């Protein structure tokens, strides 16, 4: 009988091979259960290790954001159709915080706050994912705002200038032209985009919060018709969306803008409007049973807007010198700028443009109240030429408003006051602009300089806008070198000023006013009296 031998090495090797190839089918996974779901909020039990703002996955692919982390339950903001959720549904952790895809291919597209396309043009190829709650640049990563962000609107570029990296609030009652001002600013970037110069190009993001779907479609159509959609992305959270989408939409726009800013590009982000975002956040907070404060807003509503708007910056040269300019819109009620949300955002931003319903109804459009509007960046964000010609414009208009109120009750005015009233009325008319018709900075400087120096004083008020439009065309043909000089960043030289005056006087001789009165002051010739005329007798020889 053969002797049985046992090799310990063979046994050890066999066990090692078996254990290395073995894979356990069981795995550990945290699972929660839906307790209730209503009004866009789900209460979930379980998930003891969940993080704040972590994404949670519900059945049917619906996702939510963990907000309230209580000891026995979690308050979740549902991003999607909450009506399909029911009690007892399983909830899983994803281990991820909310982020959106970003990239160059998002230009020209309409997306929702999750970065998903909603324009029916197919999927978008993303470069990377970017977290929505991204930290704003630190103090050392910034530099002062000094580059102008031209809006194409004379009243803003001259008196409340906006710089790249600035946060300028657009505030006013409903239907006063707030969105129109921002859309004109986007349209005015077309020439810079077509130049192909990265230092001039501005990528635009329009964030629509709580707007009607038809309004968002109209904005998209306007941008497309004017050739501005190719450098613009629309982030849409219409009124039909849940409060969660309206709350996150501005952060999605900021995340996309920061992606381009950190690449060294210039970005313009328009938040239309933050009042509706605050109302959506208030609704979420009340449904989550957080303690209400003033006007039922939660205590951190100031932080909601400050952490969003602080992400706008002009980066230092070491960081690539990119910029992100923010134009938040706030809607007031009865021109009350002292309400809770308006005062919050005014204190966060670097200035405000106040649009007044009374001016709008009087036909002054854009209806900018220059007395209340201010830019804390000021002349640092203006070209040299604009800074020089617009220096006295605000004072002239303020003096005109005071004198206009006084003249209502005064019967007689001296010649100087009457002249100031006449010029003020022409300046107000000059600052009016049609919608979707932004003007280049060269046109603005020439028009404001000529009007401020009295060259529009003889033009009837009702003809000012037509006179300006036709005059600019004439000056382009007569003195093109002046526009080239201004476009290069220089001030108006004495030679250029003389050339402008001469060309303007030539144009006045051919301009036809509505009532037929001449617009050039020809020297008056007094008629001779009868005794001054020497009578000669003419004799005719037959």
UniProtKB/Swiss-Prot annotation:
The family this protein is said to belong to: Belongs to the ATPase alpha/beta chains family.
Molecular function as annotated in GO: ADP binding; ATP binding; proton-transporting ATP synthase activity, rotational mechanism
Subcellular location: Cell membrane
Residues annotated as binding ATP: 172-179
Cross-referenced Pfam families: ATP-synt_ab, ATP-synt_ab_C, ATP-synt_ab_N
Cysteines engaged in disulfide bonds, as pairs: none
Gene Ontology cellular component terms for the protein in this record: plasma membrane; proton-transporting ATP synthase complex
Subunit structure: F-type ATPases have 2 components, CF(1) - the catalytic core - and CF(0) - the membrane proton channel. CF(1) has five subunits: alpha(3), beta(3), gamma(1), delta(1), epsilon(1). CF(0) has three main subunits: a(1), b(2) and c(9-12). The alpha and beta chains form an alternating ring which encloses part of the gamma chain. CF(1) is attached to CF(0) by a central stalk formed by the gamma and epsilon chains, while a peripheral stalk is formed by the delta and b chains.
Protein name: ATP synthase subunit alpha
PROSITE patterns: ATPASE_ALPHA_BETA
Provenance organism: Corynebacterium diphtheriae (strain ATCC 700971 / NCTC 13129 / Biotype gravis)
Site residues (Required for activity), renumbered to this chain: 373
Topology of the protein relative to the lipid bilayer: Peripheral membrane protein
Transport keyword on record: yes
Catalysed reaction equations from the record: ATP + H2O + 4 H(+)(in) = ADP + phosphate + 5 H(+)(out)
Record-listed E.C. numbers: 7.1.2.2
InterPro entries: ATP_synth_asu-like_sf, ATP_synth_asu_C, ATP_synth_asu_C_sf, ATP_synth_F1_a_nt-bd_dom, ATP_synth_F1_asu, ATPase_a/bsu_AS, ATPase_F1/V1/A1_a/bsu_N, ATPase_F1/V1/A1_a/bsu_N_sf
Gene behind this protein: atpA
